[in-house]
């Protein structure tokens, strides 16, 4: 049985003296799907509980022998149980993780880094979401290890409210991000005022 637990040791680069080449990510069992779409810039009807955030996020995957998205999805299915950040912004963190992992990774030693830098519009239902002016600096290390394979994740999300015009993210379930949001049980509902946008319920 596979166990999920917080990393005890840091996920770090292998020694540079080792001559072994970096392994590419293993072929995944899942179908590679297109990245999520962003709704074109437009004026939103709904003004309440809406925030623009300048996002700087990333996920570093540490795995000496490569990795598959099946393992990443397995780890993220337990995200609610292991999340250690501000719970008023857990929905935002899930959105950022999904969007970051839908991009192309950059190799760093034996690690693979997915980054996301973007200004996004988030809307929360009712009185949910962050307080006015609240910011987020979240980082966490998570590992998956079944004695035959080790995969470590370093998740980092910086979110600052800003007045730069952002894009509305939307849920395209036929995308890698959509799969990951489903795995993390992202709670949303469609906005009644703006049919193309989603309201976060967490």
UniProtKB/Swiss-Prot annotation:
Residues 115-151 are annotated as: Essential for glycoprotein binding. Its main location: virion. Disulfide bonds: none annotated. InterPro entries: Rhabdo_M (IPR006870), Rhabdovirus_M_sf (IPR038617). GO terms for molecular function: structural constituent of virion. Keywords: Apoptosis, Host cytoplasm, Host membrane, Host-virus interaction, Membrane, Viral budding, Viral budding via the host ESCRT complexes, Viral envelope protein, Viral matrix protein, Viral release from host cell, Virion. GO terms for biological process: viral budding via host ESCRT complex. Homomultimer. Interacts with nucleoprotein and with the cytoplasmic domain of glycoprotein. Interacts with host ATP6V1A; this interaction plays an important role in virion uncoating after viral entry. Late-budding domains (L domains) are short sequence motifs essential for viral particle budding. They recruit proteins of the host ESCRT machinery (Endosomal Sorting Complex Required for Transport) or ESCRT-associated proteins. Matrix protein contains one L domain: a PPXY motif which potentially interacts with the WW domain 3 of NEDD4 E3 ubiquitin ligase (Potential). Belongs to the lyssavirus matrix protein family. Most abundant protein in the virion. This is Matrix protein. The gene is M.
């Amino acid at each position: 049985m596979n166990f999920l637990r917080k990393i005890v040791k840091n996920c770090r680069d292998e020694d540079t003296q080792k001559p072994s080449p970096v392994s590419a990510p293993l072929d995944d069992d899942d179908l590679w799907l297109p990245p999520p779409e962003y709704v074109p810039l437009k004026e939103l009807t709904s003004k309440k509980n809406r925030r623009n955030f300048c996002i700087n996020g990333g996920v570093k995957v540490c795995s000496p022998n490569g990795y598959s998205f099946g393992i990443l999805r397995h780890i993220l299915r337990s995200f609610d149980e292991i999340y250690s950040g501000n719970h008023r912004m857990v929905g935002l963190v899930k959105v950022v993780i999904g969007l970051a992992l839908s991009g192309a990774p950059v190799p760093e030693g034996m690690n693979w880094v997915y980054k996301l830098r973007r200004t996004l519009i988030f809307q929360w239902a009712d009185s949910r979401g962050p307080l006015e002016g609240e910011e987020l600096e979240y980082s966490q290390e998570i590992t998956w290890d079944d004695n035959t394979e080790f995969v470590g994740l370093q998740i980092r999300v910086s979110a600052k409210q800003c007045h730069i015009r952002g894009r509305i993210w939307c849920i395209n379930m036929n995308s890698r991000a959509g799969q990951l949001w489903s795995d993390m049980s992202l709670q949303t509902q469609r906005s009644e005022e703006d049919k193309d946008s989603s309201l976060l319920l967490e």
